[in-house]
UniProtKB/Swiss-Prot annotation:
Function as written in the Swiss-Prot or TrEMBL entry: Part of the endoplasmic reticulum membrane protein complex (EMC) that enables the energy-independent insertion into endoplasmic reticulum membranes of newly synthesized membrane proteins. Preferentially accommodates proteins with transmembrane domains that are weakly hydrophobic or contain destabilizing features such as charged and aromatic residues. Involved in the cotranslational insertion of multi-pass membrane proteins in which stop-transfer membrane-anchor sequences become ER membrane spanning helices.
Quaternary structure and interacting proteins, as annotated: Component of the ER membrane protein complex (EMC). EMC8 and EMC9 are mutually exclusive subunits of the EMC complex.
Gene: Emc8
CC per GO annotation: cytoplasm; EMC complex; Golgi apparatus
Membrane topology: Peripheral membrane protein
Record's protein name: ER membrane protein complex subunit 8
Boundaries of every MPN domain copy: 4-147
Keyword terms, alphabetized: Endoplasmic reticulum, Membrane
Short name of one Pfam family: UPF0172
UniProt main location, coarse: endoplasmic reticulum
């Protein structure tokens, strides 16, 4: 599997989703730019999947529900319109010391892998969460022989960790998580935009 990297925008929105609902499990999707298919990837070419954005899905009860199907269909359509592809899934469990993927996480990630072979499953480690974002809070899993296995936990999975750390801390300090919209919020009020353009602007402004 190629390497995995997250842009600052994708990382920050994952962090903000967990911060908005600190006592709940949360989940979401990660999208990458759609690439033209290549017949061959030269060995050692340093190919990697870059997650350019994060789409927060649900908070509270995470299950394989009809609403998840609605979300996947709507977000897949949005991705096609913007030359993106759903390429990953993230989840933060309810319990602070539980950072292992459960059945829901593995099933949704496997569903994504059917359409994107290099899909990644990212688990957010709540035990590492601090307001100053001193260390990355994620564990990256890859699918190998139909099982999800954790990649090197010491690897830097952010495209620019110093930038991601600084901006995440700034957004937490300004309580930007209060304005974050997930798909649950959108279902409550369809005027709520799950692409979170205001947070995207805030990240860009702080870069």
């Amino acid at each position: 599997m190629p390497g995995v990297k997250l842009t600052t925008q994708a990382y920050c929105k994952m962090v903000l989703h967990g911060a908005k609902y600190p006592h709940c499990a949360v989940n979401g999707l990660l999208v990458a730019e759609r690439q033209r298919p290549r017949k061959e990837h030269p060995p050692g070419a340093g190919n990697h999947t870059l997650f350019v954005d994060c789409i927060p899905l649900f908070h509270g009860t995470l299950a394989l529900t009809p609403m998840l199907e609605v979300a996947l269909t709507l977000i897949d359509s949005w991705c096609k319109d913007n030359s993106y592809v759903i390429a990953g899934y993230y989840q933060a469990n309810e319990r602070v010391k539980d950072a292992s993927p459960n059945q829901v996480a593995e099933k949704v990630a496997s569903r994504i892998a059917e359409g994107f072979s290099d899909a990644a499953l990212i688990m957010v480690d709540n035990a590492k969460f601090t307001m100053d974002c001193a260390a990355p809070t994620i564990h990256v899993y890859e699918q190998h022989e139909n099982r999800w296995r954790c990649r090197d936990p010491h690897h830097d999975y952010c495209e620019d960790w110093p930038e991601a750390q600084r901006i995440s801390a700034s957004l937490l300090d300004s309580r930007s998580y209060e304005t974050l919209v997930d798909f649950d919020n959108h279902l409550d009020d369809i005027r709520s935009d799950w692409t979170n353009p205001e947070i995207n602007k805030a990240v860009l402004h702080l870069c």
